[in-house]
Swiss-Prot record:
Keywords assigned: DNA-directed RNA polymerase, Early protein, Host cytoplasm, Transcription, Viral transcription, Virion
Protein known as: DNA-directed RNA polymerase RPB7 homolog
Description of its domains: Contains an extended C-terminus, with no homology to characterized proteins.
Location(s), subcellular: Host cytoplasm; Virion
One of the record's GO cellular component terms: DNA-directed RNA polymerase complex
Similarity-based family: Belongs to the Asfivirus DNA-directed RNA polymerase RPB7 homolog family.
Domain of life of the organism encoding this protein: Viruses
UniProt source species: African swine fever virus (strain Badajoz 1971 Vero-adapted) (Ba71V)
Role, per record: Component of the DNA-directed RNA polymerase (RNAP) that catalyzes the transcription in the cytoplasm of viral DNA into RNA using the four ribonucleoside triphosphates as substrates.
Up-regulation conditions: Expressed in the early phase of the viral replicative cycle.
Any one GO BP annotation for this protein: viral transcription
Keyword Transcription among record annotations: yes
Subunit description: Part of the viral DNA-directed RNA polymerase that consists of 8 polII-like subunits (RPB1, RPB2, RPB3, RPB5, RPB6, RPB7, RPB9, RPB10), a capping enzyme and a termination factor.
Length: 339
């Protein structure tokens, strides 16, 4: 994720006399030299956007070095990864009996370790590009390093899903706060509309939870899965339209919400029920409407970005064909696959 953060630090100044001849210029240059292109406080700093606050240049009195120091608050554009993030393009750089190592081609520099216990060790070849999901609490940003490190695995379609029990209505103010995430989804959908339709179909079918025969077609315009996979008696709602109605107090968020496997993962759809009849493996999560919608919207964003990145990375038939072993691994983990 790209974001802007504010940091506080103390800079050591070797030549205070020269530094103070043009503090602003020297300070910005020093910050860029130390932090840009490196890890710092759980982020990878892309560029410094400004100095917010600084102290005077103090002279060290604990020795006779003549050096100085300055306390600084600065803002920076950063990139950072979270647990369970999806990365569409990780190039395998090492694969032996002990470990798989890959480097992300899309995010900040990060080395990803796929544990040797994973069955995909015998599938991915050095030089191939694989889609990866990061593990829980697995991203490490060691200060000063020029790349982060993480653990993960080749991303396989998920069979499980969560059910959320909402007992209080979403307020207009909360709905307004969610429009930033809605805008991101609309931007990603616009980007998706400009991509090759055959590629979108290929990857949507690849990551659909159920095994799909060649004569079954996904309707990507109305976000429905193949015939026979829809949930009976239930009609999904478009979360984006729902939130626009919530701004006008025209929708009720009470009840049970879920995005089960029959929906395309990058669709903006979800199911809402008065009584819970979802066939989930875990008990419903009781939470506020705002927390539930933030969770659903972020999931939609992650999958949409993931699908767009897959289309951009594997942008020709030859490249897709060279990775058939990876697609076969993914297909074998689907519900309904004949082993």
């Amino acid at each position: 994720m790209i974001d802007q953060k504010i940091f506080e630090t103390t800079l050591n100044i070797d030549d205070p006399t020269n530094f103070c001849t043009n503090v602003e210029a020297h300070l910005l240059k020093e910050l860029e030299n130390i932090y840009v292109g490196k890890c710092f406080k759980n982020s990878f700093i892309l560029n410094i956007t400004g100095v917010i606050q600084r102290s005077p240049c103090f002279i060290m009195r604990t020795n006779n070095s003549g050096r100085g120091y300055m306390h600084v608050r600065f803002s920076a554009v950063v990139s950072y990864l979270n647990a369970f993030d999806l990365i569409a393009a990780v190039k395998i750089i090492k694969n032996d009996s002990n470990i798989i190592l890959g480097e992300s081609l899309l995010t900040e520099p990060v080395t990803i370790v796929i544990p040797s216990s994973e069955s995909q060790n015998n599938v991915a070849e050095v030089g191939q590009i694989v889609p990866v999901q990061l593990a829980n609490s697995s991203v490490y940003y060691i200060p000063g390093r020029q790349q982060a490190s993480a653990t993960g695995s080749i991303f396989i379609p998920k069979h499980t899903f969560s059910v959320y029990h909402v007992q209080e209505e979403l307020t207009q103010e909360q709905a307004l706060n969610l429009t930033k995430l809605v805008n991101i989804i609309e931007m990603l959908l616009e980007s998706r509309s400009k991509k090759d339709f055959k590629q979108i179909c290929f990857f949507e079918k690849l990551y659909y939870t159920y095994s799909i025969s060649s004569d079954e077609i996904l309707d990507l315009k109305i976000w429905k899965g193949p015939k026979g996979k829809e949930m009976s008696r239930l009609k999904p709602c478009n979360v984006l339209s729902f939130l626009y109605d919530a701004l006008k107090n025209k929708s009720s968020s009470l009840g049970f919400w879920a995005r089960p496997p029959n929906l395309l993962k990058s669709s903006p759809l979800a199911y809402q029920q008065d009584q819970n009849s979802f066939n989930a493996t875990e008990l419903p999560i009781i939470c506020s409407a705002e927390v539930m919608f933030v969770t659903l919207l972020k999931e939609i964003i992650n999958y949409l970005q993931f699908m767009n990145d897959l289309c951009d990375t594997f942008n020709n038939e030859q490249l897709i064909k060279r990775h058939e072993n990876i697609w076969m691994l993914i297909e074998q983990r689907k519900i309904g696959h004949d082993f």
